Amino acid sequence: MSAFVTCGATVPFPALVEAVLAPEFVGCLSREGYRVLCVQFGRGYDFEAQFTSVTCTRMPLESAEVSELRQLVRDERVTVMGYKVQDVVVLGFAYSNNILQIIDRYGDVVISHAGTGSILDSLRLNKKLIVVVNHTLMDNHQKQIAEKFQNLGHILATNPTAIELCDAMKRLKHEDLIPLSSETNTEFMERLKSIAYS
């Protein structure tokens, strides 16, 4: 199984990246049967620096795992990195215009920042979704959005710590999340507008 993490492409979310790369969380993934963790960390973030104090092995660019993600990213300007941490392959890239295919490939579970676009992308692909609120943002509409989607039963919402993410992963096994309707839903669109503008 694979877990996909998206921080969005525009606003860095270092707390989320650090939480998912923490040994406690990688260990939790391993115990839950996940073998790949793919992280879209956003522009301007030093992903490699996160591995200086972690026991890991850098994977060669020509390895099957790194090569597959490079093909999905479809942009030679974007560096794709891979590390073996414990028994989990950790892949990372800054951004991609092909994000839906990447979510579809690596998202047995998706851990996302609380941006509406990323939430809807994952829900439209019928992915199990854990949403993490970036509390450093001013006028934190992300919290309202995450709470509303959670109250509707579509997602689990949590905070950017390894312990809380592990707890959310365990809860996810027992939650029956409600899929988002695939048809155009005027009621849902109005509800989303009211959340975004309230």
Swiss-Prot record:
The keyword Secreted does not apply. GO terms for molecular function: identical protein binding; N-acetylglucosaminyldiphosphodolichol N-acetylglucosaminyltransferase activity. The keyword Transferase applies. Keywords: Endoplasmic reticulum, Glycosyltransferase, Transferase. InterPro entries: Glyco_trans_28_C, UDP-GlcNAc_transferase. This is UDP-N-acetylglucosamine transferase subunit ALG13. Belongs to the glycosyltransferase 28 family. Its main location: endoplasmic reticulum. GO terms for biological process: dolichol-linked oligosaccharide biosynthetic process. The gene is ALG13. It comes from the Eukaryota. Heterodimer with ALG14 to form a functional enzyme. Its EC number is 2.4.1.141. Involved in protein N-glycosylation. Essential for the second step of the dolichol-linked oligosaccharide pathway. GO terms for cellular component: cytoplasmic side of Golgi membrane; cytosol; UDP-N-acetylglucosamine transferase complex. Pfam families: Glyco_tran_28_C. It catalyses: an N-acetyl-alpha-D-glucosaminyl-diphospho-di-trans,poly-cis-dolichol + UDP-N-acetyl-alpha-D-glucosamine = an N,N'-diacetylchitobiosyl-diphospho-di-trans,poly-cis-dolichol + UDP + H(+). It is found in: Endoplasmic reticulum. It comes from Candida glabrata (strain ATCC 2001 / BCRC 20586 / JCM 3761 / NBRC 0622 / NRRL Y-65 / CBS 138) (Yeast).
